Amino acid sequence: MADKMIIVNDANFSSEVEQSSLPVLVDFGATWCGPCKALGATLDGMIDGYEGRAKFCYVDIQEAPSAAMKFGIRSVPTVIVFKNGTPAGSLLGAVSKPKLEDLLSVVV
């Protein structure tokens, strides 16, 4: 998990992600997942560049099983970008910064 990301769970997923006026990148991961930590560091380095244009959130699938099930998360890390509360694109695995930027370009 990245230090600057908003922590989201089943209780606040709707308010932080689905009701957000900004596009939201959601990183679905787990504390035991090595690739998730690598992706989190990459995302943490990107957040400041999107300030005011997008939100970055982290969901621990063990802490938010309903959100993980709702969006069909079967492996971690999985990144989904949301616009107006609706998924607009996704990536699987610890992907590169350029791929994450391409994904965000769909919604920002």
PLM regions: where:
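A short beta-strand-turn-helix
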Residues: M5-V24
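Conserved helix-turn-beta segment immediately C-terminal to the redox Cys motif
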Residues: S21-P23, A38-V59
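Non-catalytic, surface beta->alpha helical segment in thiol-disulfide oxidoreductase systems
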Residues: S75, V81-V108
